[in-house]
Structures are given as C-alpha cells and as structure tokens.
Amino acid sequence: MLDLEVVPERSLGNEQWEFTLGMPLAQAVAILQKHCRIIRNVQVLYSEQSPLSHDLILNLTQDGITLLFDAFNQRLKVIEVCELTKVKLKYCGVHFNSQAIAPTIEQIDQSFGATHPGVYNSTEQLFHLNFRGLSFSFQLDSWTEAPKYEPNFAHGLASLQIPHGATVKRMYIYSGNSLQDTKAPVMPLSCFLGNVYAESVDVLRDGTGPSGLRLRLLAAGCGPGVLADAKMRVFERAVYFGDSCQDVLSMLGSPHKVFYKSEDKMKIHSPSPHKQVPSKCNDYFFNYFTLGVDILFDANTHKVKKFVLHTNYPGHYNFNIYHRCEFKIPLAIKKENAGGQTEICTTYSKWDSIQELLGHPVEKPVVLHRSSSPNNTNPFGSTFCFGLQRMIFEVMQNNHIASVTLYGPPRPGAHLRTAELP
C-alpha cells in the first residue's frame, strides 16, 4: 500500500517520486514506468474521436488514484484519490488516512483545521469540504438524512454542519479556490530537469513556402550558485532551411537523440526513384522531444532539409514520445475571393477545415503503416499523408493532425538572423 504526503495546491507523493500539478504527461508516465513493480494496473483513458473534449486520464486502479491532464496543454490539472481504502495519506508528516485511522470529518478538522462551511450536492448526495487547493467529499449515511441538507431547508443553515462520523469518499488536489474552475498551472521549475520546452513554435514562410521556425523557449534559470534564485527563463530562437548542424546546435542546444535514417520509404513516390544514385551515407534527425520537433539534416551537406512538428495526440503510434508542439502555420489561400489572404493552422486544427481553406490535394493520400517490427500490427491503425504547399500533413482517422513535415530546398548561404540586422 502506498504511503503518500498530501501538499494542497501542489502535489501527492513520497520521498522517491511526486505527482506535481502542472507536470507534463510524459513525466508522470516516466514515474509510473520506473516504479512499475509497485504501481501496477495503470489505465490510460481518452476520447478516441474527440480527444480535446475530455481530460486525458491516468487511472491507477490498484491504488485508487486518478490523474487528470488538461486535454490541450497535457499538464496535470487534478489529482483525485477516489478509493481511500487503497492508500495511506498524511499531511505535514501526520497520517489522517490509514488502516488504523479513518478519514472522518473529525479527523479532517483535526489535521487541516477550520475552513468554510461544507457544500451539499444533492445530485451526488455528497458534502464537499473545500480548502484552498484541496477538497474532501463526504458520503451521507442514508437517504433519510439528505432532505435537511438541501439549501432551502432551515434557510440553508443546516448545511453548515456535516454529520458526525461521516467519512471521506474522495479527495482532490488542484490549483486555486474552485475545483470546477481549476486549470492546469504553468509547469513548476522542479519539472524542467535541465530540459528546454517550447511555449510556441511559429512557422516562418516566404513567397515560395515555409522557410524556418521561430521558437519561444522556456527553461529554468538559476542565480549565481543559489538554487533558491531559480526562475523561469523565456527566450526566442530561429532555425531555417539550409542552416548547418552547428547553427542548430548553437540555437537549440544538443538534441535528446540523433537518429540515422536507414532508408527513405517515401522515395518511391518521387519522380524516377530507380534512377537515384544510392547514397553511401544516411540523412540524420535531431530529435528534440521536449520541443515536439525533429530536424532532418542532409547527409552530404549537413544542412537542414526538413522539420517535423508533432501534436502528440493520444491514439497515435508516437504518443507520449514527444511533448506537444504548439505550432502556428500561416497558410496561403489561393481562392479567387481570398486576395492573397493567409489563414493560421494550429496544433488543434482539423484536416477538414484545412482542406476547405487550401482546396483538396490533387493526389490521393499516402497511407502510413507504423509498427515496431514487420510482424507486429499497429493497434491505433493507419494514418494518411497529404502534401500541400511544401508541407506533408499526417492525419489521424479522427480527422486530427498527428504531425506536419515542412520541407524546402536548402538555401545556399546562412540565413541572416534578426540579431545581425542593422
């Protein structure tokens, strides 16, 4: 049985690990994977057809804990303990829930002190006792007690008193004063772990198509040798097609991984693929997992030739490998009445809406089958790749975009950076 410390408006954990509000989904999954012998039977719950309409949930069934992640930013929004009999809980080092201590209203008062009157929910038949960043739900013993706690009974004053001996049915940890209005907080500094994250990624374009990326980056910076002076650092960097490997390293730092392509599976769709001379060396990717970006370099020139932006939707083969890339892509509208107008494609745009703006592709999509080995099948099914305006949109079966690949001819010279402008 897990023995965990409750920190209102912040976290639930122990000396080995901690689920912290604002934590990225990937970090929570990494904790579960590392401690898989202790924390077992974890379920991932999401809406397959409408992944943005419901929270993404990690359900720790063995331990009675549910982690709710915001569907958009994929950061931890609410920590719910839904079965208190499966876990030990303490506050400031003192247990208020264990096999020997029942979490009664008297025990909660003793451990957490006074707060506002409890609020009765007649639909759930539960009392909610709210502290800042922490709520307890109490179950009424019988239906006969319910009417006197209705708001219109005794001018609402009866709801000031939760019945003696009532025990906690659920506990919630969240940010702010209201569970209903809570949002996932910004990522805590403790979750950066030396990584750089992208707050937003803007696709730059010229008259012919995409030309590069402008990234707004977040990092945890420290004062001179004092950890307590740690604070969020925000800065911008730009990388372009034709930039050298050294240019990218100086802008974004070292990648999490370098991946060398063994073969080009899309080469068969290029004109006269059989006439292409086999290369003696392979193109390679810089994988920036916390940015949600891959950068492909030409094996001969070591210049940028492609960018890949990942949306990290559940139900995709690469889910949870990349942090979600919050991109914005300007699209050139070619309709007669558009008059050179541009529209913005984002991480949350659906393929149908993009097709309405750009027109349907001339060619049929390329069907992409992913699997870990030739003998394995992908349980999430195939995706479809459409090419438009020097971009390849990988589309899932629910009409959401899984990734966008930007490509273009390498530029002959290094791109003039903003900092170098007169």
From Swiss-Prot:
<dbReference type="InterPro" id="IPR005373">
    <property type="entry name" value="PHAF1"/>
</dbReference>
<keyword id="KW-0963">Cytoplasm</keyword>
<dbReference type="InterPro" id="IPR039156">
    <property type="entry name" value="PHAF1/BROMI"/>
</dbReference>
<comment type="subunit">
    <text>Interacts with BCAS3; the interaction is requrired for the association with the phagophore.</text>
</comment>
<comment type="function">
    <text>Plays a regulatory role in autophagic activity. In complex with BCAS3, associates with the autophagosome formation site during both non-selective and selective autophagy.</text>
</comment>
<comment type="similarity">
    <text>Belongs to the PHAF1 family.</text>
</comment>
<protein>
    <recommendedName>
        <fullName>Phagosome assembly factor 1</fullName>
    </recommendedName>
</protein>
<dbReference type="GO" id="GO:0000407">
    <property type="term" value="C:phagophore assembly site"/>
</dbReference>
<dbReference type="Pfam" id="PF03676">
    <property type="entry name" value="PHAF1"/>
</dbReference>
